[in-house]
Amino acid sequence: DRPWVIKDIRGGKEQWVYYCNTDWYHEMFRDEHPVQQHSISVSGGSKNIKYFLSGGYDRQTGIMKATEPDVFQKYNMRAKIDAKLNKIMSLSNNMSFYSSDYSWIGVGDIQDVFRNLRHTPASFPLFNPDGTGLYNNPLIIGGNYNVANGRQIVFAMGKHKNYDKKFNFANTTELVIRPVKQFNLTANFTYRRVNRNGMGRTVNIPYGIRPGVFGAYTTGAGLNELEERTRRYDYYTGNIFGTYEDSFNNAHNVKVMFGFNAETYRYKNVTAKGQNISDELLNDFDLIVPDPSTGAKITNLEGGQSEYALAGFFGRVNYDYKGKYLVEASGRYDGSSRFAKGHRWGLFPSVSAGWRISEEPFFAPAKKLVNNLKLRASFGSLGNQNVKDYMFMRTISIDDFKAFTFGEGSTKAQYAGISAPNSSSLTWETTYQYNLGLDASMLNGRLDFTAEAYIRDTKNMLIQGNALPSVYGEDAPKENSADLRTKGYEISLGWRDSFELLGKPFNYSIRASVSDYTSHITRYANNPDKRLTDYYVGQRIGDIWGFVVDGLFATDEEAKDYQANVCDALTYVGTNRMQGGFLAGDLRYVDLDNKQEGEGGINKITLGDNTADSPGDRKILGNSLPSLQYGINLGFDWMGFDFSTFLQGVGNHYWYPSGMNIAFWGSYSYAYYTAFMPRDFIKTVWSEENPDTYFPRPRVYSSTGGELAPPNSRYIQNVRYLRLKNLTVGYTLPQKWTKAICLDKVRFYFSGENLAYWSPIKKYTKYLDPESAYRRVTKKSNDGLYQNSDAKDAVAYPWQKTIMFGIDITF
């Protein structure tokens, strides 16, 4: 009952003064939300006609505590019919329909509210005592801080509406003609339409400045604006191919297939914006009113369209001798309009061979133990034409001068501009893969084992070309100038069996799998010096370079001695980030190369030449790609009860949190990033009374440009985990019961998703899911220090635990 907000005279005016302890996440998000899933299917037919029809509806209510919660709805339907027209012809049609609708209250994308709540101090309430929203007043950091950027007001108003609607329709019609037993001719055509429409509406955000004085946020999130977006995708695909299959002398089996494929893709988008909508509840461009200052309506319309075509010939030949020796050769010859003439066509052959060792006479003594043993090897190539449309040509665009007019009137002058230079020699990126595998089945099929190793070479990857002269004023065009080699393996082991339990069969199974891979750059044309600011030959993809830290300074004297003899200042840290120099509780960096940087002063903690061969005092601390990925499936059924579970995990996955990841750094990022500070955070922070802690001396902005910003060995995290991905328990009623009510099968079940996980990251924060703790390799700083940084790694929609109860009924 304490007065969390009081009125007081400050600066000669009556003001609100805040002494709150608000849990902003609890106030803005709910812990539980309902989920619905419904599905139905019908199948049947006769000797010559068979049909299948299914449909489903899903509805998920989100976690937002707005006037209207965020809601996702999905409808799907599938209809298939197969008809035998006569002795040699059959016709089938397969149609699918999918529609989804996601609506939410907010500004822009759904992650917006997470971004803004990160920096909301608990000392502020959501609203003032008079009911007005809290946004800004002179007492809040001198009037220079906006509480939650007004997102709690947005939730309460319910007028910032957004939706994203998707519609997906696909239909495939196929005709098969079989004039003789050994040969058939197949022709099919697929049409797919995808529509995606979206809307975003923002309105002015009113708030209270002080008692009786009000303001409004009218820019950015508070701009009175309506935006509507529409996207349309059309796909046309046709295939015609013939297949010949025959056997000779009960030993030789041959299958030959050859065909032609053609695809066309068209895309169009339109985005319209308008400001000054006359009604906050109605969203229509007809309600735009002129801007009072100019007398003109503020609108913007933009869009574009593109298309590409793909054509190709394909074929495959299979041969086996008594099911013992197996050979397959296949290939594609594809052409894409995304490349210039002379570079459009690519040939992509593949070949594989298998040897069923268990069919050899010499293997007969072991066949009771090993029922099937197969050795296989393959080589294959695959083309990739996923580049932007028209990338090989320069395009011309027309735009208006924003501030210049010619002649009388207000019509803006127009100009034409040409795009940056492109390489006309762009062509297919090609992947070559070599596989070696072993399949085994033992103990009458109860135990099975599969192992496979592979090497994948990706050739002619697109990268930025050699830099053009600076006077040219444009970036270099992209070229096919990089190669990548990936090596990996996959292993799977399974066991299934049954035994009698209380006179009833108890069937059970267990399966475990593990896989791993590494990727290295084998060619990269534009970085011969191996600068750490870019990719380089020999680099393992995902490597994290960082400094080595061997602890925290115990005393100020120890810190000053280090500053006098090892490093007087960290040149890559902003001067305002370490005021007072090194002090007790700061990180003690290790001088790995014993080299001095520059003239004057003492600085042995350096970046060296910033290359892989001369990285200064940095080394590779770990790798940001997950390794040793594994999964375990367990299941059994007995007397109508069934149980299954799936555990999934990663053996190693190194990650260095970005500066604004408050779930890990808390107030080390920004002083006012306290909305999600862990309750026991102060116990983990260094102080003279508590020196043996994990986190260092509190310094504002430490993780956003300070000593914690560059990756280091102390705070790099191994976010390996084991997750209980799914657990399902069901019970099927005895058939004698269901038959009595004219039903074939009735099953009740419970299912849980993401029920629990185990990870070492829990030792330092329980608010961070290991699968959301990752760094996208999207941008590198000029000095290469933040080569894996991504400020958005803490604002994804939270991982959710799902618990479902359901019933399956079969008629």
Give the ranges of each region predicted by the language model.
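Conserved small-residue
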Residues: D1-Q15, V107, V270-K273, S498-G622, ...
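Glycine-rich, aromatic-lined ligand/substrate-binding cores of catalytic
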Residues: R577, G581-F582, N623-S658
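C-terminal beta-barrel architecture of Gram-negative outer-membrane proteins
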Residues: F646-Y721
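Short Pro/Gly-enriched beta-strand edge/turn motifs at strand-loop
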Residues: V17-Y25, T299, A612-G616
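A generic beta-sheet turn/junction motif
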Residues: G44-N48, Y57, Y321, M442-N444, ...
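Surface-exposed beta-strand-turn/loop segments characteristic
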Residues: D1-S41, F52-F72, F127, G133-R151
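Extracellular/periplasmic, surface-exposed regions of secreted and cell-surface proteins
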Residues: K80-S99, Y145-T202, F214-V548, G705-E707, ...
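Transmembrane beta-barrel wall of Gram-negative outer-membrane proteins
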Residues: M28-I105, F169
